[in-house]
Amino acid sequence: MQELFITADDRTGALEIGGIVANTQFSVPVGPEAKSDICCVVDTCSRHLHPEEAKRIVFEKHLREARFHCHKIDSGLRGNWPYEIEALNELGHDVALIPSYPDAGRRCDGGVVYIQDVPVLESPFGQDPLTAPCSSRPDEVI
């Protein structure tokens, strides 16, 4: 059984989390159909899809046997992450939502996600024409 299976909603997120995990001294395949006995990251390409389609894809990918399942969301809360998290819940996986990447100036404080000390909705992420977040507070969305 695979130790760690990770999905990400876009290629940059997949490469980002793959690089972080690879820093733990083992190789991490990244791609749409990546496979490994230890850990791999699969890019679901789901950020710009209809929410139900994104949920279906994440659900199907996470049918794979693994000790731990993770889904990397956008730290600016863009995309279909609420639906993708719902897929993990429906599969019986415990979910911890951690919308932060402090090294890039993205953090969650008091339940509000900040980009360079600006609430995400007031940041450039909040102006994304395709996948802007609907709140700076993830708990208001899920």
Model-inferred region functions:
Residues 1-5, 25-31, 53-54, 62-69, ...:
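Cap/lid and interdomain-hinge subdomains that line or gate substrate/regulatory clefts
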Residues 2-21:
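N-terminal signal-anchor module of multipass membrane proteins
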Residues 8, 42, 99:
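Active-site flanking residues adjacent to catalytic metal/cofactor-binding acidic residues
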Residues 11-13, 45-47, 102:
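Short, glycine-/Ser/Thr-/acidic-enriched flexible segments
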Residues 15, 49, 78:
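Conserved protein kinase catalytic core
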Residues 26-43:
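N-terminal glycine-rich anion-binding loops that anchor highly charged ligand groups
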Residues 39-57:
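Short, structured active-site "lid" loops
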